[in-house]
Amino acid sequence: KFLLAIAVLSSLYSSSQSTLKMDFETYNPPSTLVVPGKPVLKAKYPFIDVHNHQFGMPTMDLGTLITDMDKMNMKVMVNLSGESGETLKKSMANVKANYPNRFIVFANIDFKNVGESGWGEKAAAQLEEDVKNGANGLKIYKSLGFSVKDINGKRVTVDDPRLDDIWKKAGELKIPVLIHTADPKPFWQPMDANNERWLELATRPGR
């Protein structure tokens, strides 16, 4: 009987312990830190959203977007994803035809073929053309310095001199340049139990 009682208790303990186990990715408790008040859904004063990504702007119904902007009192949206060439021209045509005073569009650089003869001059010329077509700035994505490689397979750094023509042209055009760079150090370390960003890297591998 004594041994049976021990076996039963051991079984109950093991069962209770198993119910306490949970995958780290599953653990997401609601916060108990609750403050009085209600969510602010509309800004008191008109504001400018300086960081937005609207990839479908060439063909999207801007009226729907404007409705959402008006609900929160957003006066102007800066779309950092204007791309380049014909795509940017179509975005600007859509904006000018419908809401010319509500959007600012930034161009982007196509970093394919870095290292080819004359690549920098061509990229700078395309940027100038994009500005003529309505772009108000240049947005550089985190891929530069992270995944962009030249024609020889070598990673292209942000301070690569082959990009100097682009920065020079941006200065001549007097347009702002926004660069997303310097990812956290753990992004470059082994993805194991010692990486403090493991959960982020596991659940969002494309970051």
Which residues does each predicted region cover?
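Sec/Tat signal peptide C-region and signal peptidase I cleavage site
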Residues: 12-16
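Active-site gating/metal-coordination segments in enzymes
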Residues: 18-19, 38, 88-207
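A generic structural motif
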Residues: 6, 79-82, 105-110
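An N-terminally biased module of ancient metal coordination in phosphate/nucleic-acid-related enzymes
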Residues: 17-101
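Bacterial N-terminal signal peptides
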Residues: 3-11
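Residue-level detector of alpha-helix boundary/anchor positions
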Residues: 8, 40-42, 171
